[in-house]
Each structure stands twice: as C-alpha cells, then as structure tokens.
C-alpha cells in the first residue's frame, strides 16, 4: 500500500508543477492546435488535448483541455514497476488464457476476449498487443501493485518521461510501433516509440458510452528528445487510441521533423 500512496503523492506533486510559459514554441503550438482540431472534428470528439515536452521537462506546446480520468496508458508504467524489481523480464512468458482471467480476485478481460484471447505470449508481446492480463500477471509475479489512478494528460506525460530511461522498456515501446498496435503512429521521417490506449470514461444507459482515446510516445526512439501525448474524448464507437490519437501523434512528429 505504501508504494501506491507514494505514487499518488508523486502524481499530486506533478499536478502542482507550474508551466514555464517562456518554453512554449508559439509557432509549433499553432500547428499542433490545427492538427488536433482537425482530428477532433473528424471523429466528433467532445474534448481533447495534445502536449509536447522535451526531456528536461520543458513544455514546448500544449493545446486543448485535459481532465483527471482513467487512462490505460498506465500499463507501461505498471510494467516498468515490475521490471525494476528484477523478478520479471520482457522475455518471460505469461498465459493470457482465453482473454479472461481472474487475478487477485478481479476479473480482467483483454480487448480480444470474445475471439479467444492471446494465450501464451511473452511480456514484450503482451505490451505490444495491449494485453491487460499480461501486464497484470507481470505485476503479480513481481509482487508489486499495478498503478491505477486518475490522471490528467500532463501528469501522464511526466510519469512517462520518468520511465523511458529504462532500455528494456524503450525496446518494448519501439516494438509496439513496429510489430504491435501502434503502427498508425509510425513516421517515415524519424523512428518513434510509444503506446496507445482506450479507456471507458462513463457509461450512461440513455447515451453512448464516453471513451478516452490516447497515444503517448517519443522520438527519436534511440535517443529521445521530445515526448508527446494526445488524448481525446468521444461518445460511442469506433474508439481507437492507435488509429485516432496515434495518427495525431504521427502528424505532430512529421511536422517537427520537417523543421
């Protein structure tokens, strides 16, 4: 429990960190705003935010509005926590069963549970296919708690920046782009790495469910200089973090790489 409380405390501290307005690139921010607004209009999003940060923590662009909400982008954070113990490795095999598993009393479903799940896969493959079960079993094997907290996109980006110094995780996040669900975010101008997700924000019987579609990543993949998060909320399906938020990430990266 102490580790969870410390995590919540660190997230709270992140929220209090002021943004240095002098670090904002106004030209870049205008371009990012246009890219985000175009995609939001295309998918009928009700809100959205895009943030660019350099590796020193300076904000280069921040457009739109973000709020505290669940985020499936926490999976790489939880996996990082497990890897840091040295008790599990990306090459370890876990059984995701038929896409439904009971772990620590909780029923966890992978997105493809109705198609029979992924079965036995490595943890690297588990992250690449966004398997909730694989990450949950990794934390269980390592004896740590999975991180599950409400966060803003800015808080999420700062947490993400803190883990991408881990070379093993960096290789897994690159693999997510080349061989996993993040192919839509791939750029032909520079190698990128990252992770996408979709979270259910609210379910109202009288309305379509609200989803958050998100992508978080960085470039260049080998020596990160900038990290980017894109988060958009929309009503109803389709709702894909990789296809929707990932394409915004790609457009932003291409814009920056062209400078």
Report residues per predicted region.
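Short, glycine-anchored, charge-dense loop/turn motifs used at functional sites
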Residues: 50-62
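Bacterial Sec-dependent signal peptides at the C-terminal "C-region" and cleavage site
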Residues: 12-23
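Active-site SXXK
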Residues: 32, 57, 68-97, 126, ...
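Conserved catalytic neighborhood of penicillin-recognizing serine enzymes
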Residues: 88-144
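Beta-lactamase-like hydrolase cores
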Residues: 22-53
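A penicillin-recognizing enzyme superfamily signal
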Residues: 26, 133-136, 148-256
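Sec-dependent N-terminal signal peptides
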Residues: 4-12
């Amino acid at each position: 429990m102490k580790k969870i409380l410390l995590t919540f405390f660190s997230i709270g501290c992140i929220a209090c960190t002021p943004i240095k307005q002098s670090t904002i690139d106004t030209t870049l921010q205008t371009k990012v705003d246009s890219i985000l607004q175009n995609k939001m209009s295309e998918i009928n999003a009700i809100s959205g935010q895009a943030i660019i940060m350099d590796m020193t923590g300076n904000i280069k662009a921040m457009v739109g509005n973000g709020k505290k909400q669940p985020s499936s982008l926490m999976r790489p954070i939880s996996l990082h926590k497990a890897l840091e113990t040295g008790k599990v490795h990306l090459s370890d095999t876990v059984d995701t069963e038929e896409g439904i598993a009971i772990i620590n009393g909780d029923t966890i479903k992978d997105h493809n549970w109705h198609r029979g799940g992924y079965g036995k896969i490595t943890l690297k493959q588990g992250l690449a296919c966004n398997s909730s079960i694989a990450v949950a079993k990794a934390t269980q094997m390592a004896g740590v708690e999975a991180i599950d907290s409400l966060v803003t996109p800015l808080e999420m980006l700062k947490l993400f920046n803190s883990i991408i110094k881990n070379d093993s995780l960096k290789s897994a996040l690159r693999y997510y782009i080349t061989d996993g669900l993040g192919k839509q975010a791939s750029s032909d101008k520079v190698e990128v790495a990252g992770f996408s997700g979709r979270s259910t924000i609210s379910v109202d019987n009288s309305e379509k469910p609200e989803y958050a579609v998100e992508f978080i990543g960085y470039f260049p993949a080998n020596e990160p200089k900038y990290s980017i998060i894109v988060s958009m909320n929309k009503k109803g399906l389709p709702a894909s973090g990789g296809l929707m938020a990932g394409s915004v990430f790609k457009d932003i990266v291409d814009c920056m790489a062209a400078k």
